[in-house]
Amino acid sequence: MRLACALIAALASPAAASEPVPIAVIDYDYLDTSGEPTDQQAQHVARLAEFMRSLRADLGAEGALRVVEIACAAPPCTAGGTPPAVLIARAKQAGARLMLYGQIHKMSTLIEWANSEIVDLEADKLLDSKLFTFRGDTDEAWRRTLAALRQHLGT
């Protein structure tokens, strides 16, 4: 069963089964510990922005989930840059039932990983944790990773 459908089935009450489940998608953190001499920060910022834009669009596209925006006082509005209690409070204020957050970590010239977590905010419970490893630091490598995350989430 696709993860998104399984999550929604687990969360939905019979009365609200037809309503999309609101999810706050927190910007992912990015960490580069590769030690490469070339400054690639601009490329990484652009890739991460596109990754997040596409992820949010895909999650809301089928109608089972409704992506909600949270208000952040100052960037970065990420799990690494904002205390968890603040993110959770803001997600709840925005009406979210679920919260998705994660990190992309460039470990070496060729190896990166993407970690994604989904939390049920009402039950205060981690529903899903997935680690994807990927090879390469190119637009195509990031697109493949996003495709793998989409498949995992069922979007």
Q: Where in the sequence are the language-model features?
A:
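Bacterial N-terminal signal peptides that target proteins for export
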Residues: 1-5
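Hydrophobic h-region of N-terminal signal peptides that target proteins for export
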Residues: 6-17
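Short beta-strand->alpha-helix linker/helix-N-cap micro-motif
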Residues: 20-31, 35, 39-40, 51-83
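A short, hydrophobic beta-strand-centered structural micro-motif
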Residues: 23-27, 81-116
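Solvent-exposed, acidic/flexible segments
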Residues: 37, 41-52, 80, 84, ...
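Extracytoplasmic/secreted envelope proteins and their assembly/folding machinery
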Residues: 48, 52-56, 88, 142-146, ...
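Sec-exported extracytoplasmic/periplasmic mature domains
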Residues: 56-64, 92, 150-154
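Amphipathic beta-strand/beta-sheet edge segments enriched in Tyr/Trp
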Residues: 97-138, 142-149
